[in-house]
Amino acid sequence: MMRLLLKSLQFLYNIYAMVLFVAIMLLIFPFVILSSLAGRIKGGNMILRLCMFWSDIWFPLVFIRIKRKYESPHDKSKQYIFVTNHISYLDSAVLVKAYRQPIRPLGKVEMGKIPVFGFIYKKAIVSVDRSSLENRIASLRILRSILSKGISVLVFPEGTFNMTNEPLKDFYDGAFRLALETHTPIKPVLFLDTYDRMNHKTLFSLNPGRCRIVYLDEIPVTDLKMPDAPFLKKRVYDLMEKKLIEYNASWIQPARRLNKKNVIY
């Protein structure tokens, strides 16, 4: 009986959260349309700020607490290629809380097909169809152009949801080759709790609680060249994997997780 009651309450909570999600989106939508007239760069930055405004309203109203931890000082005025683990539908919403600076995420082209949200999505991100080599090349060309304007980019190097019990899936090469080509430092960032707040199995798994964001040490690329891309990818992967285990990320198989007394943060 109690289990049925809890499931009913979670269902009602999810309906409430989705109604708020859409209502706030519709509230900012006219301003998104106006901002889009300002062009890819200026207009995109304006739309990003509107998305930040959306997130600043939505997260408190659905009782999700964003907590940030900086393992090293983070300079918001500096340009980075951010790389983040991808474990939940909620990652897309959390990223506008995580990155409070001009930035363009690389995202799936399929999300742009959703009414209203898709329009905002396409104006705020660089879309990629990973099934098309031509489209992947075009997306990297756009990212290079954005970096040349002094704007940071965000890449989920796993490409798709990590549906395993491992800390991370294998990384694609694109972010690391782009970093070497443009001499842009990499900043790894961890989303520790988005899986717990809303796992990848269903959109109706959202629940309130904390959502931790951890900013790891910057990884410079000034002394590296293009043949070093595999080394750079492994260095970033190893660091993120190590930290996810240290922070006891909940999706990791028990044998690889730390004892509670050794968990940090």
What does each model-identified segment do?
Residues L4, S8-L37:
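A hydrophobic membrane-anchoring feature enriched in long, contiguous, low-charge segments
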